[in-house]
UniProtKB/Swiss-Prot annotation:
Coiled-coil stretches noted in the UniProt entry, renumbered to this chain: none
Main location: plastid
Purpose of the protein: Has a function in the early stage of chloroplast development and palisade cell morphogenesis.
Cysteine pairings via disulfide bonds: none
Protein name: Protein DCL, chloroplastic
Keywords, sorted A to Z: Chloroplast, Plastid
GO cellular component, one term: chloroplast
Protein location: Plastid, Chloroplast
Top-level taxonomic group: Eukaryota
């Protein structure tokens, strides 16, 4: 359960970080 939760957070966070880096 924890692993799935972390994977879900990463999937939501990585695109956000990439978006911020573009700016």
């Amino acid at each position: 359960a924890w692993v799935d939760w972390e994977d879900q957070i990463l999937q939501d966070t990585v695109p956000l970080v990439n978006f911020v880096r573009m700016i």
